[in-house]
Amino acid sequence: MRTIAILAAILLFALLAQAKSLQETADEAATQEQPGEDDQDLAVSFEENGLSTLRASGSQARRTCRCRFGRCFRRESYSGSCNINGRISSLCCR
C-alpha cells in the first residue's frame, strides 16, 4: 500500500512538472505569435547582389528583411536568424 502511494505521488509530481512546462511553452508561443511590441522592425535592404544599400528608393529591386520573434508573416520568407538584445530571432525577408 505504501509503495502505491509513493508511485502515485511520483506520477502526480511528473504530471505537474510536465503541465508546467507545457503552460510555459504555450505562453511563449502566444507571445511570439502576436505582432506588436516585441516586433522590433529592424529593416535591412538588399540589392540583387546581396549588399546592404543606402540609396534612394526606386534605384533597383530590393529585399527588405526584418528581425522578428516567432514566425515570418505570410508574404515573407525565412532567410536565417538574427539577434535582438541577446534573443535569437527569425530573419524574415520580402
Curated annotation (Swiss-Prot):
Cellular component per GO? extracellular space
Against InterPro entries, the record matches this protein to: Alpha-defensin, Alpha-defensin_C, Alpha-defensin_N
- State its location(s): Secreted
The record's keywords, sorted A to Z, are: Antibiotic, Antimicrobial, Defensin, Disulfide bond, Fungicide, Secreted, Signal
Q: Which residues form the propeptide?
A: 20-61
SMART domains per UniProt: Defensin_propep
Do you know which Pfam families this protein is assigned to? Answer: Defensin_1 (PF00323), Defensin_propep (PF00879)
Q: Signal peptide position in this chain?
A: 1-19
Task: Report disulfide bridges, numbered on this chain.
Answer: 65-93, 67-82, 72-92
GO BP, one annotated term: disruption of plasma membrane integrity in another organism
Q: What is its main location?
A: secreted
Stated role: Defensins 6 and 7 have bacteriostatic activity against Gram-positive bacteria S.aureus and L.monocytogenes and Gram-negative bacterium E.coli and antifungal activity against C.neoformans. Defensin 7 has microbicidial activity against Gram-positive bacteria S.aureus and L.monocytogenes.
- Family under the similarity heading: Belongs to the alpha-defensin family.
- Name listed for the protein in its UniProt record: Neutrophil defensin 6
Native source organism of the sequence: Macaca mulatta
